[in-house]
Amino acid sequence: KYRITQATGRVVDKMDPYAFYSELRPNTASVVEDLSWDRWSDEEWLANRNKGFDRPINIYEMHIGSWMKEEEEEFVNYRKIAKKLIRYVKQNHFTHIELMPLCEYPFDGSWGYQCSGYFSVTSRYGSCHDLMYLVNEAHKAGIGVIMDFVPVHFVKDDFSLSYFDGTALYEYPQAHDADSQWGTANFDLWKEEVRSFLMSAASFWIDVYHFDGLRMDAISNAIFWHGNKQLGVNEGALNFIKRMNFLLNERYQGKIMLIAEDSTDFPNVTKSTFDGGLGFDYKWDLGWMNDTLKYLKKDPVYRKWHHNNITFSMAYFYSERFLMEFSHDEVVHGKATIINKMWGTYEQKFAQARTLYLYMFTHPGKKLNFMGNELAHWREWDETKENDWFLLSYPAHDAFHQYFAKLGELYTSEPTLYANDYSWESFEWIDADNADKNLFSFIRKGEQNDYVVILNFSPNHYAHEVFGVLQKGMYTEILNTEWNRYGGTLDAPAQKCHAIRVSRNNKPFMIEVDVPAFGGVLLEVKK
């Protein structure tokens, strides 16, 4: 540690802000660590990685300490968990792992979002080399790794960056600017020294640990003072974000992903800095998440009055490159898990959750799910407990898990569902206005095929329901959320619907489809 005699005469022991490693909490001293590692074998992966605009991106967000516990061990180890984790991720057709923050932090309950060591990998889960091993193994298996990075605020603990020499070095000098809503200190992003510190830290994780991207936390608190639009734009912080993204893109030749967690409607977040934007590649679509879950919490009797909660996302979707997410924030603090947010009985919750995920995986935009979503987790996430893996011994959860993996397989193998996500030509509503029936239908358009997606968020079965389509030919059912192998009640062969030349929904052809209660249907037509 550094022993610093401050201007007031107070003597304080501080960690090294640039340390590569630290003691395990509650101890706080910095540790000298050799970062050289001669076992990297991911050269081919690094050469071929890119931002993935025309690729499938299906992210598994996880808290490494609570995914799967080791017996009699307080913490899992990066190296020990690597092969098991990577095998699981591949089996479920995820393309990337997103690790919640791994910068050192003192308080377990902050999940890593209240950092103390911006160059120090948390010692909870092993050594620097253990983390390198995990990333290297993921790359060898064709899995990308993204890390959460927190460039807006830091812990106020005495041993850390706060009032490092007795003055406001890293934070704003005025308390009303420095104090964040989380009880942490806001970085003074107007200072060149602070900007350099954070840009160096961002580069460090990509250079040293080969991360494929950074998900930037709390960007709304950089755009606006305290994240509050009424307080105005924080121009200094905004300029920092633009410069950091510009330099990261320049340094890594546009090959790493920069993802913004931003809850505001501030424009041009994913526009290039050359064109006046912030320079991110993707932005979490928190509006879509909120609107969709709000709709599905409601009794179906009242959903027709909130129909636009589902349709509104496509009104603004092409303004940014959005990433559709159900993250850790949606399954904590009394909000209930995804399946438990669904209205209805046990069986109805599962049925609606299956239809919800069909909607998610066929909606334009890249995908992210927090660990446990794929299990239909009932219990809210708790960082002290592992996932409830025992749920897979229950038929409903096991079937849902298989269904979730099938959606991932379908999404990652079908270019129509990902290649032109951000082109308006890839999506067309069939009927966005059937509020009385709680029905939604749209087309995902591709070069080789089209997909027709039908979503029924009502408890009514609609037999021989008519939908307009663009192409003639045979429409074959690829997936039905009510097939019994996925936990539904339907034991029937796939529907084959022949399009006839009758105009419907302003389309030249029409098909008749049986749509199950609380169910979704996915049909394919070849071109």
Residue map of PLM features:
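Substrate-binding/active-site clefts of carbohydrate-active enzymes
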Residues: 23, 45-54, 63-233, 497
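C-terminal beta-strand-rich structural cap/linker in extracellular carbohydrate-active enzymes
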Residues: 494-527
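Catalytic cores of secreted or luminal carbohydrate-active enzymes
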Residues: 396-417
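Conserved, mostly hydrophobic/aromatic
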Residues: 2, 62, 89, 99, ...
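Conserved alpha/beta catalytic core and glycan-binding cleft of carbohydrate-active enzymes
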Residues: 210-212, 226-386, 412-467, 471-482, ...
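Active-site His/acidic residue clusters
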Residues: 113-116, 382-391
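Surface-exposed loop/turn motifs at beta-strand-loop junctions within extracellular Ig-like
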Residues: 4-8, 103, 527
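The feature marks proteins involved in alpha-glucan
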Residues: 1-61, 66-73, 80, 489-496
